[in-house]
């Protein structure tokens, strides 16, 4: 099994950055408290507060799938109401089940491992 990473670019609706950050805090707290196979979940904001880049790092494709199934529905609804997905990139060995789950995000670019330090 290989680790899986994802990079998601979200466009923040004008004036909604604080709500998006609140949702992000919920996701990060939940992962820290109850999802040991989520290795990292980080949100980065551009200087204008218009774009958020999410870096996700999972122990495996199964861990990413489990995270998607465990997401707080209220926080997910808040994020969906105040952002739009600009792009999604997934890195690592992914399963058909994970691909199916990610299909709801729109077009997803997948990259398989080629060369790595680890």
Language-model segments: residues:
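Short S/T/G/P-rich N-terminal loop/turn motif that feeds into the first structured element of a domain
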Residues: 1-52, 59-70, 81-118
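A short, acidic, amphipathic alpha-helical segment used as a generic capping/interface helix at domain edges
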Residues: 72-76
């Amino acid at each position: 099994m290989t680790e899986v990473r994802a990079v998601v670019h979200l466009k923040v609706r004008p004036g909604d950055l604080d709500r998006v950050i609140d949702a992000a805090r919920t996701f990060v707290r939940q992962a820290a408290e109850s999802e040991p196979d989520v290795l990292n979940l980080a949100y980065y904001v551009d200087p204008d507060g218009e774009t958020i880049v999410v870096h996700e790092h999972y122990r495996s494709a199964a861990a990413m799938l489990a995270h998607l199934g465990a997401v707080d529905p209220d926080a997910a609804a808040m994020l969906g109401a105040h952002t739009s997905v600009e792009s999604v990139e997934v890195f690592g060995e992914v399963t058909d089940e994970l691909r199916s789950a990610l299909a709801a995000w729109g077009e997803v670019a997948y990259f398989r491992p080629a060369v790595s330090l680890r």
